């Protein structure tokens, strides 16, 4: 008991994070089935190399959990919760490479308390595995590039491929890696390393089933996510209401703590200005 009290006193912020996750876990049985949950659960029950609107990673993971724990709404929610918890742990590891211990704890609190992360803990979407494999990709690339650990090029290739198999936006990982090396005087020399190209080749091989499915289905998914989505964007009209509404929406979803801080300081500033007037 003394050791537990000592841990809590020395790791207040970490305990807050654990408390958030315990709370989320306890309410899992009371969260109902959402349309997205049922939709992507059917992915896993009808296995394919890919699907019309997204690759199938979320469906595969739902199938894996249902095979182990059975088919139920709770198991679907447990899948999302488990993957999101792994994402938090991966984020903590990644952030530890860049931040001091104090800033690391604050960063962990910020990401854990985001409304967006709470939604992902209870709602099956391609973003659930995307965030995990994206974060793992960055961890492996950090090890490979900055610490010159060759084997992590292989792990990075696998992680980048699995991220793409979660959602197409993960293709930006490879582009981001190449762009970073182009603009980095220190690490541009890695273009001459076979490990870089081996990593990219591995990622392409992991992604290959998605390309194969698209090839056999007239590239239906790629077309849907590119030209059709682009045409809908072209119809969008910018207005002040939409602009500021979008900013507020992102702040609320991604950084609610920071959002509340901004509101608090803004109100204090307005009150102070009014009193001075």
Whereabouts are the PLM-identified features?
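Transmembrane-lumen/periplasm boundary regions of multi-pass, lipid-linked membrane glycan transferases
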Residues: 174-275
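Short helix- or helix-capping micro-motifs
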Residues: 17, 107-115, 160, 164
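Transmembrane-helix motifs of polytopic, lipid-linked glycan transferases
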Residues: 14, 78-100, 113, 136-140
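Membrane-interface transmembrane helices that cradle and orient dolichyl/undecaprenyl
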Residues: 96-101, 137-152, 264-268
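Short acidic/glycine- and proline-prone juxtamembrane loop motifs at membrane-interface regions
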Residues: 35, 116-130
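Extracytoplasmic catalytic/substrate-binding loops of multi-pass membrane glycan-assembly enzymes
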Residues: 27-41, 50-62, 70-74
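Specific aromatic-rich, kink-prone transmembrane helix
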Residues: 45, 88, 129-146, 152-160
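Membrane-interface alpha helices of multi-pass inner-membrane proteins
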Residues: 152-167, 203-205
